[in-house]
Amino acid sequence: MKHLITGGSGFLGNLIAHRLLASGEEVRILDIWEDPSRPPEIEFVRCDVRDATGVGNAMRGIDIVHHNAALVPLTKSGKDFARVNIDGSRIVAEQAAGRVRAFIHMSSSAVYGSPACPITAETPYRPIEIYGRAKLAGELAVREVCEKHGTALTVIRPRTILGPGRLGIFQILFEWIAAGQNIFVIGDGNVKFQFVHAGDLIDAYMLALRLGKPGIYNVGAARFGTLREALENLVCHAHSTSRVRSLPAGPAIRTLRALDFLGLSPLAPWHYLTYHKPFYFDVNALLQLGWRPRYSNDDMFRESYDWFLANRRAAGAAKDGSPHRRRVREGVLWLLKKIA
């Protein structure tokens, strides 16, 4: 079969493309940025998802669409969140309608906001910031189009992703730990907090694809503890002199919101409004389907940190492409190093 991956040059889309290629599938990527390391066997189409004509042309001969193109919280894109994550998603779904066998939509845990845990597919949607609201509206737009045209729809909602090559805000965390700088949590950090390894996520993704069973799949680690435990265990693994320090939740959130508004911090509302609260999925439904995740929170943090150290120079030089695959500026967060 032939697959079209929107956002296929991004961190996750790139992994999906390589896994499909390794499985003997034909792959076409649609993205505004071309990864220079893209294998020649993977076809590339330079196109914005808001370009209906270009997207329609890219659909020719496609059996399955994998919609991963999106603006992520780190981009702080304001009104463009709606233009890309909502309007762009609708355009991709409309251009796929009546032409493909199935549509797989990459959603986000941000659609839930900050609900009671564990989170299931039945948990109400209550996004609390601009990114989550745009992702939810985009998902609902895709669902509306797919239902209207009878397109089989699978929705994947991952927890925060870790793994080799994942940079973004994790690059700041890893640099601080490597330098022995103290790291900070909002509140005491003693909240159950789930991540997901990119490899486990792709395994779940491919399982859903193979089963051909439309529906919603929430994907997160099966083994995890608190956020503080994950960070303290990583510091121990790194043999670092860093310490995990607590910031009072109220003042910290107000300060980070002001810095965000002024464009002085890389942290977006999704980060500072949720990382001090419990957040984890119930993944029993996936386990019953045969999904076998390999990584705990601690495992994935260790592997990601070790990859970062081994590839630090190249990772620091990356300036183009997905925000999750390149360096992020600290902004005024560097001041925390001075006062810690």
Where are these regions (language model features)?
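Mid/C-terminal beta-alpha module of Rossmann-like enzyme folds, strongest
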Residues: A208-A268, R302-E303, R312-D320, W334-A340
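Active-site Tyr-X1-5-Lys
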Residues: I128-T154
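Conserved Rossmann-fold NAD(P)-dependent oxidoreductase catalytic core, especially the SDR/UDP-sugar
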Residues: I91-I130, C146
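NAD(P)-dependent short-chain dehydrogenase/reductase
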Residues: V145-F193, A198-D200, L234-V235
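Glycine/proline-rich active-site loop of Rossmann-fold NAD(P)-dependent oxidoreductases
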Residues: L136, H149-T151, L162-I172, A198, ...
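N-terminal Rossmann NAD(P)H-binding glycine-rich loop of SDR-like oxidoreductase domains
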Residues: H3-S23
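Conserved C-terminal active-site "lid" loop/helix of NAD(P)H-dependent oxidoreductases
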Residues: A198, E232, D260-R292
